[in-house]
Amino acid sequence: MATLDVNPELYQAQLADKIARLKAMFVDYSMPELEVFESPVANYRMRAEFRIWHEGDDMYYIMFNQETREKYRVDQFPAASRLINDLMPLLMDAMKGSPILRHKLFQVDFLSTLSGEILVSLLYHRQLSEEWITAAQALKQRLNDEGFNLNLIGRARKMKVVLDRDYVVENLQVNGQPYVYKQVENSFTQPNAKVAEKMLEWAVDCTQESKGDLLELYCGNGNFSLALAQNFERVLATELAKPSVEAAQFNIAANQIGNVQIIRMSAEEFTQAMEGKREFNRLKDAGVDLQSYRCNTIFVDPPRSGMDIDTCKMVQGYERILYISCNPETLQENLQVLGETHQVVRFALFDQFPYTHHMEAGVMLERKK
């Protein structure tokens, strides 16, 4: 994790800089007015990872300065959720007093939620014994007795010990409606939960009064699929990562949403299937008849690399395109293609990563008349 200067007094200035940069990047496009969604100024980040430094009998969390690579001690981390900050000193004190828990511990990862659940992963440069499991169970019990809703994972080379779950269940509010999301350790989740709620509300607003079905590429754990399902007859969503697909299935059931179908495919494979270039048994096995879907709208939330040219061409086949981007530079590249056939009708900046140069953007495109 990068060096971060969390200074609430500077929040508006850093946001203004992002607004100016994003507008400048798209000055050559006919863009509508930019909608801006702010972050909480502190305690916004639901995940955090720290290295562990051992110094005699002492042990503490450290991070590294990105520019100098110098380590520095971290006892509290203002970017992280209050839950993480509350747990950090108690966890460290408990581990310091346990030779078996501290021996060759080199990293601690936290995954917290707005729902109150938290998952802690302890990473070791040694194999984990039965003695470690006993000590870890006692640690978990001790912290839960202090009021935390905590699960623990121990990791070592080719080894993973789960006490008792390797996921948390998050609860996000979308226009007052609660949605339950299973978030699995080491799988992608939106790091800024409050901004994630705003992104979902914006996407729901963009797709009001939609007709037909929705196709979604790169759906992850179904984060957007579930919230958007209310605006469509059916949702067909694709995702390649197996843990994310399994989490998405859990989330569909937990939210009792009956019109979402998730299939495990890459965007590139799905493009081939849609164009009839290849047949996939997994589509048949899942009972998915692509020809039965009437998808007028497509939703894409690609990785930082954006969409490849073939996927862009496939996406151009839809009347409306909703595109969430964690890298506006690749969004810019993709818009050079999409802009041939579509025009941008909504444009948004989501400040997922305050006090960094990273920006999250959203655009809604409609086919040119």
Curated annotation (Swiss-Prot):
PROSITE patterns: SAM_MT_RNA_M5U, TRMA_1, TRMA_2. Its EC number is 2.1.1.-, 2.1.1.35. One of its GO terms (biological process) is tRNA methylation. It comes from the Bacteria. It is an enzyme of class 2 (transferase). The active site is at residues 326, 360. It catalyses: uridine(54) in tRNA + S-adenosyl-L-methionine = 5-methyluridine(54) in tRNA + S-adenosyl-L-homocysteine + H(+); uridine(341) in tmRNA + S-adenosyl-L-methionine = 5-methyluridine(341) in tmRNA + S-adenosyl-L-homocysteine + H(+). Keywords: Methyltransferase, S-adenosyl-L-methionine, Transferase, tRNA processing. Pfam families: tRNA_U5-meth_tr (PF05958). GO terms for cellular component: cytosol. InterPro entries: MeTrfase_TrmA_AS (IPR030390), MeTrfase_TrmA_CS (IPR030391), SAM-dependent_MTases_sf (IPR029063), TrmA_MeTrfase (IPR011869), U5_MeTrfase_fam (IPR010280). One of its GO terms (molecular function) is tRNA (uracil(54)-C5)-methyltransferase activity, S-adenosyl methionine-dependent. S-adenosyl-L-methionine binds at residues 190, 218, 223, 239, 301. The keyword Ribonucleoprotein does not apply. Belongs to the class I-like SAM-binding methyltransferase superfamily. RNA M5U methyltransferase family. TrmA subfamily. Dual-specificity methyltransferase that catalyzes the formation of 5-methyluridine at position 54 (m5U54) in all tRNAs, and that of position 341 (m5U341) in tmRNA (transfer-mRNA). This is tRNA/tmRNA (uracil-C(5))-methyltransferase. It comes from Vibrio cholerae serotype O1 (strain ATCC 39315 / El Tor Inaba N16961). The lineage of its organism: Bacteria, Pseudomonadati, Pseudomonadota, Gammaproteobacteria, Vibrionales.
